[in-house]
Regions:
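Cytosolic regulatory/linker segments at or just downstream of nucleotide-handling modules
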Residues: 549-594
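Catalytic NTP-binding/metal-coordinating core of nucleotidyl cyclase/transferase enzymes
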Residues: 412, 416-490
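Cys/His-rich short segments
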Residues: 227-295
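Hydrophobic ligand-binding cavity/cleft-lining segments
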Residues: 1-46
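Regulatory cytosolic signal-relay segments
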Residues: 371-423
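Catalytic core of nucleotidyl cyclases, primarily class III adenylyl/guanylyl cyclases
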Residues: 429-430, 461-489, 493, 500-536
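A conserved amphipathic terminal alpha-helix motif
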Residues: 1, 112-157
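Hydrophobic-ligand binding "helix-grip"
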Residues: 31, 57-106, 112-114
Length: 594
């Protein structure tokens, strides 16, 4: 039968960015409209492309379809297509174009159906007739919420059951009584009950820290404590390095698979603590059961970090209107293949060429456009991806170096014999100077109490700077930090805190010396806990012995870190050489006495 189509135009009294966040967010729109979730599968084709299929049952009728990749440029336009295998339609397509009329904007939408039979013909006309009213209603609600400074259009009012309310009340009290609640429990509960299921499938504490305008550590600790108390559940997701979709899940870090396959990208990859192993969260089913499925898989709302996506036939070139914010972007194909990274500085966008599976940047595209060329012999979909979203991913590398994780998830350890490489981590070793003399001077009981108090001081500083105490050793600690600057700032504060403790509370001589080093390491299971092994950690321990009371001793590699160098500008940095056990050549040691 012939295609039935209709175009509509809408005016919106707010900027185009806000309009885009509404009309392009098809997953949340689908859930808010009461559409059923559907299941999705992927099939690799002989030419390397991926076909995505959807399936759902509506009113007892099973529908299945192919869902080709959607095309879009953020803030400007998008188009989607479904090719049905059965049911009343052969196909359904939508195309939307947005126009910036600063400070207002406008939207043009074309919706079309190809009916398979008379039922499809009448159903298409009915759906098209209702479509305009639904879009206008959505925009009117959005207009009211924006005016009321309540921009979350797709919030829901989920009602807890009486038993869940009682459970949540007890859980909230338990969390608030710990040091990890930070007064944020109410905000978390509002999020769990006020957001759609789409928002709750994968909850990211770093994203909520930004939303709540609080320190990232506060949100992470809140989430970890909430898992402990039964408000949330946690899981380890292994993300595909290309499409960034979770391809393996496990509850315990010791059960992470060594190798993972992504059917969509047709690649095998390994779990990497720093790059693609994420600790994510969802509500406990005892509080709010969340059902998983898709409302719209192919649209821009499902992958908001993808700013542009376009399918090109062999030999096809397209000049697309485009605008990208300054920042770092990754260009890749939706299919397995090459990728490259470029930095956009708000000037002209580069020309993108695909030739024999290789992506290359050409000259500048015309102002306000981006030129895409597919010079390969097969159809390919080019993807432009904003890399800043990675900052919201709570990696295994980051969370396992936090004290709250050690305190609350001590059962999360690697399998015996497993090793995980950590690409960059900083280690701090401390030692209580002249502790033997201290015990002799003031007695075992008093000295032991002093040692415990000094451990508490150091532990508080370590946690404040997002570090973790790996273990205590002798009269000192072995701590780990994700970044070198955090390790240095914590070490400086440790020295200052111990000095204040000594001066304010007693005349007993107590002081520490510290050694710091950074680099790669191996995470292992040692005595049923996460520990670290390798040259980096060994050298940090040796550096500690080089200092005197009040000193911080550092390696050359550590002090050459740009963030560390900036901090050290405020201190007198001294350098000397030392020969360490097991080495012949002298090694540079750098020291400050803050």
């Amino acid at each position: 039968m012939n295609e039935i189509s209709k175009s509509f135009k809408f005016d919106f009294n707010h900027p185009v960015d806000q309009l885009w966040s509404i009309v392009a967010d098809t997953p949340r729109w689908g859930e808010a409209s009461g559409f059923p979730r559907y299941q999705s599968t992927e099939q690799l084709q002989t030419d390397g492309t991926i076909k995505v299929f959807g399936e759902v049952t509506i009113a007892g009728m099973n529908l299945s379809w192919e869902e080709p990749p959607a095309n879009w440029i953020e803030g400007l336009w998008f188009e989607q297509l479904r090719l049905f295998n059965n049911g009343p339609f052969d196909s359904m397509a939508t195309r939307a174009e947005l126009v910036d009329k600063c400070p207002q904007s406008s939207l043009s939408i074309e919706i079309s159906f190809v009916p398979r039979n008379l039922l499809g013909y009448f159903l298409a006309r009915r759906l098209i007739a209702a479509f305009r009213g639904k879009v206008q209603q959505l925009l009117d609600i959005a207009d009211q919420l924006i005016k009321a400074e309540q921009p979350d259009l797709f919030e829901t009012d989920f009602q807890l059951s009486p038993s869940a309310k009682e459970r949540v009340k007890k859980v909230k009290q338990a969390i608030d009584q710990t040091e990890y609640g930070h007064g944020l429990t109410d905000k978390l509960l509002e999020y769990i009950t006020g957001k759609q299921e789409v928002d709750l499938w994968t909850m990211r504490p770093l994203a909520l820290a930004h939303r709540w305008q609080v320190e990232p550590r506060f949100a992470i600790e809140l989430f970890l404590q909430s898992v402990r108390e039964g408000l949330l559940e946690s899981r380890w997701d292994v993300l595909c390095p290309r499409c960034r979709v979770s391809k393996a899940k496990t509850d315990n870090i010791g059960e992470l698979p060594g190798k993972v396959h992504c059917h969509a990208c047709n690649i095998d990859f390994e779990a990497n603590f720093a790059r693609n192993v994420e600790l994510s969260f969802s509500p406990s089913p005892s509080v709010r059961a969340v059902e998983y499925g898709y409302y719209c898989r192919s649209g821009p709302g499902f992958t908001p970090h993808i700013k542009g996506q376009c399918t090109l036939d062999p030999g096809e070139s397209r000049a697309l209107p485009a605008r990208l914010s300054p920042g770092e972007y990754r260009i890749r194909t939706l299919e397995a293949g090459d990728e490259l990274i470029f930095t956009h500085d708000a000037n002209l966008l580069p020309e993108i060429n695909l030739l024999q599976g290789q992506l290359k940047l050409g000259g500048n595209s015309p102002d306000g456009e981006i030129l895409l060329h597919n010079n390969s012999p097969v159809q390919r979909t080019i993807v432009i991806e904003d890399r800043s979203w990675l900052s919201e991913v709570l990696t295994a590398e980051r969370v396992t170096t936090m004290q709250a994780f050690r305190d609350l998830f001590s059962d999360q350890v690697l399998r015996p014999g497993d090793e995980i490489t950590i690409r960059n981590i900083s280690f701090v070793f401390t030692d209580l100077v002249d502790s033997t003399k201290l015990f002799a001077d003031i007695g075992d009981a008093a000295a032991y109490q002093l040692v415990r108090e000094h451990y508490a001081i150091l532990g508080e500083v370590v946690r404040k700077h997002d570090g973790t105490i790996v273990k205590t050793r002798g009269d000192g600690i072995h701590a780990a930090f994700l970044t070198p600057d955090a390790a240095l700032l914590a070490s400086i504060e440790m020295q200052q805190a111990i000095r204040q403790f000594r001066n304010a509370s007693r005349s007993d001589p107590i002081s520490i010396r510290i050694g710091i080093n950074s680099g790669s390491s191996i995470s292992v299971n040692l005595n049923d806990r996460l520990d670290y092994y390798g040259k980096t950690v060994n050298f940090a321990a040796r550096l500690e012995s080089q200092g005197r009371a009040g000193d911080i001793s550092m390696s050359r590699q550590f002090v050459e870190d740009p963030a560390v160098a900036e901090i050290l500008r405020d201190y007198n940095l001294h350098e000397h050489e030392a020969v360490f056990k097991g080495s012949i050549e002298p090694v540079a040691v750098y020291q400050i006495a803050p």
